[in-house]
Amino acid sequence: MDFVERLVAAQRSKHTVAILGVDPQLDTRTTPGVPSGYPLARFCCEVIEACAPHIAAIKPQLAFFEARGLDGMRALAEVLKFARGLGLVTIADAKRGDIGTTSAAYAEAFLGDGDFACDAITINPYLGSDALAPFVARVRSGRGLFVLVKTSNPSSGEFQDLEAPHRPLWEAVAERVHGWGSDFIGAEGLTPVGAVIGATYPAHARRARELLPDSIILVPGYGAQGASAEDSIVTARADGLGAIVNASRSLMYAYLKSSDGVPGTAAAAAALAMREELNRALRAAGKSPPT
């Protein structure tokens, strides 16, 4: 199966739009890292396994693995292999984008068949279409893309909302994404060339769905970033497909608010609660969870 088929099958079998962002953060005075006594891969895999019945995919944030050097990259390879063994779709949150030859190397690293191979990748469109061409080429071999269009962070509007001719810059990017994906629309009416649209900007999300009627929307912002379930499902179709909602810290670090402090147990409860809250929001909006 290709990326869209695998993702849709996972969503339907688990009745979910939820995915897990695997963000094993570095220890700071304000942010917890990996629990004491846990190897990095063990912590991530325990949370992934616990959340697996309630999520369609994982989205490892590569920076948190890269920051730990060789040990971190070995852990990333182990985490991806473990997730694939559970039948989960894997999305590399890499936000790559460079001149053609460099992008080709990134595409080989994360959309090829090596240690860090994933089903899809997040990419940065700032360098233009020639920089994204090597990634788009991988769609033909069954991979997926999520292009940064309107991101969830507070200062995203500094550039993304600037007025280009006749529309904001982010809308111009969305129109390009629609063009890149139009040749790959499959049986579900969805293209594997998707977009990242933050739930923290629901009005933008509604407009994005108009511009991207066939794209799968990767939705950050739910959970620790403060977006509501109602805002997070704006881009989902009536059948619940076409959108996946990410949560990272609220699942990875749910154990900090639990009585027993066990990462897996707390993550499972948080993932179930997330799935059910999003499904309630879908129904309230006149939509249905994926079935």
What are the residue ranges of the model-derived segments?
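A C-terminal functional module that forms or caps the active site or interfaces directly
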Residues: 199-246, 250, 254
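Short amphipathic alpha-helices and their capping/turn segments at secondary-structure boundaries
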Residues: 1-14, 48-49, 131-142, 230-238
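Short, well-ordered coil/turn segments that N-cap beta-strands
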Residues: 14-18, 53-56, 86-88, 117-119, ...
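Conserved anion-binding
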Residues: 26, 94, 98-194
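Conserved, mostly hydrophobic/aromatic
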Residues: 20, 58, 93, 121, ...
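Active-site-proximal loop/turn and secondary-structure-junction residues that shape catalytic pockets
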Residues: 24-28, 62-66, 96-98, 125-127, ...
